[in-house]
């Protein structure tokens, strides 16, 4: 095989591989997944804002102005700071207030997804219940069914 044949062989293989990849990438499932990931990322930002800008301030107002994001426990005696950012600079800290906020984010996302999926399942169930009943058999189908049933019973025509 000379170099020209080798180049042609690799071009054909590459073209076939590129076509297979294009077919895979253009399948509905891959495109749907990409859209889902993009929407999910945007939804994550909305939930983060909901928790940080709406829910946590309400909880903070109820609890007398507590800001959970700065709650931490120092794991070293050298940590003397009052804010989480400063405490992290001074040494090891257990940032449990931040963990609480992230946990609330998760619970809200899970609750919203549960509500959406539950609603979709109810709509799907209602759609299945409202489907029209199967069509009544035609006269020809009824006669064929009767003939079949008679043949099964062995009551065919007498000679």
UniProtKB/Swiss-Prot annotation:
Question: How does the protein associate with the membrane?
Answer: Multi-pass membrane protein
Q: Please state where this protein is localized.
A: Cell inner membrane
What highest taxon heads this organism's lineage?
A: Bacteria
Q: Which InterPro entries match?
A: Mechanosensitive_channel_CS, MS_channel, MSC/AndL, MscL_channel
Q: Which UniProt keywords apply?
A: Cell inner membrane, Cell membrane, Ion channel, Ion transport, Membrane, Transmembrane, Transmembrane helix, Transport
- Key word Kinase present: no
Please give the Gene Ontology molecular function terms for this protein.
mechanosensitive monoatomic ion channel activity
Q: Answer whether the UniProt record assigns the keyword Transferase to this protein.
A: no
SUPFAM superfamilies (alphabetical): Gated mechanosensitive channel
Q: Which ranges does the record mark as transmembrane? A: 35-55, 97-117
Q: Name one GO cellular component term.
A: plasma membrane
- Pfam families registered for this protein in UniProt: MscL (PF01741)
Instruction: Cite the PANTHER family for this sequence.
Output: LARGE-CONDUCTANCE MECHANOSENSITIVE CHANNEL, MECHANOSENSITIVE CHANNEL MSCL
Q: Which NCBIfam families match?
A: mscL, PRK00567.1-4, PRK13952.1
Q: What does this protein do?
A: Channel that opens in response to stretch forces in the membrane lipid bilayer. May participate in the regulation of osmotic pressure changes within the cell.
Q: Which family does it belong to?
A: Belongs to the MscL family.
How this chain assembles, per its entry, is:
Homopentamer.
Q: Can you name this protein?
A: Large-conductance mechanosensitive channel
Native source species: Rhodopseudomonas palustris (strain ATCC BAA-98 / CGA009)
């Amino acid at each position: 095989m000379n170099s020209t044949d080798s180049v042609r062989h690799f071009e054909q293989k590459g073209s076939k591989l590129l076509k297979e990849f294009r077919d895979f990438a253009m399948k509905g499932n891959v495109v749907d997944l990409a859209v889902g990931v993009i929407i999910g990322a945007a939804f994550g930002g909305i939930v983060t804002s909901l928790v940080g800008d709406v829910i946590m301030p309400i909880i903070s107002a109820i609890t007398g102005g507590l800001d959970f994001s700065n709650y931490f426990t120092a794991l070293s005696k050298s940590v003397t700071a009052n804010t989480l950012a400063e405490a992290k600079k001074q040494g090891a800290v257990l940032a449990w207030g931040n963990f609480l906020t992230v946990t609330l984010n998760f619970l809200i996302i899970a609750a919203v997804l549960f509500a959406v999926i539950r609603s979709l399942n109810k709509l799907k169930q209602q759609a299945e219940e409202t489907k029209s009943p199967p069509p009544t058999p035609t006269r020809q189908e009824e006669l064929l069914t009767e003939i079949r049933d008679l043949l099964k019973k062995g009551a065919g025509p007498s000679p």
